[in-house]
Amino acid sequence: MGNDAEAAVLRISGGEELIAARGGSRALDPKSGHRLELLTERKIKDKALDMLEAAAVPGRIELSMFYLADRDIVRALLDAKQRGCEVRVILDPSKDAFGRTKNGVPNRQTAARLVKKEIPLRWAATHGEQFHVKMLYVELDNDLATLLLGSGNFTRRNLDNFNAECDLAFTAPLGHEVMVRARDTFERWWNNADGEIHTADYTVYEDRSVLRRISAWMKETTGLSSF
């Protein structure tokens, strides 16, 4: 799949033919519960939705994201919360992006919707930099979990085949080192462990502006946005 994705980009850009990598590959043993997937654009969204739909009840769902605006994914998070999953979200406050000052769109508007339905949410405590993480951790049945991370923001622009994106989805038992580190990292950020300030309370960047809510909706709907 990796070669196919790279070959597609080369065709679009008029590049030379891709040289196939030499050497063998080793497949993960499906009986062990391990699975590794390389996903691009729309397939990232499909995987995220599948993960959220398959989440164990009760089970942990932990999302760390730079931009969150895709309506299907937001709905899936709300549905998972309603089913009894333990959902927590850390978002960039959308106040800085690539050296420019922003007005909070789209994350503060999305956050308001999540918090209204009692999903705990914290902001990355940024100081001019960006919380450029795109990571979704979901616990499944049979003591398994899937970790999805890479370049794709959870927005229409990134997930509906308008921008070249690439993510990895890794499924393994809950006790696998990767899953343990993913949970520990999220907990450290969430709780500001060891005196380090990683996140801030929701109220710090809460935004009740109706105009900005409409703006966020229009930008996500039309695609006329930077996210």
Short names for language-model regions:
Residues M1-A48:
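Active-site cores of enzymes that catalyze phosphoryl transfer or operate on phosphate-rich substrates
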Residues G2, K45, L49, E53-P58, ...:
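DNA replication sliding-clamp ring fold and its partner-interaction surfaces
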Residues A5-E6, L52-E53, F186-E187:
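Short, Φ-rich (hydrophobic/aromatic) sequence segments
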Residues R22-R26, D50-E53, E86, A111:
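Short amphipathic alpha-helical segments, especially helix-boundary/capping motifs
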Residues E37, E41, M65-F66, A124:
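Glycine- and other small-residue-rich loops at beta-strand/loop junctions that grip anionic moieties
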Residues K43-D50, R71, R75:
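Short, contiguous clusters of charged residues that form electrostatic/catalytic patches at enzyme active sites
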Residues A56-R60, Y67-F227:
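PLD/PLD-like phosphodiesterase catalytic module centered on the HKD motif
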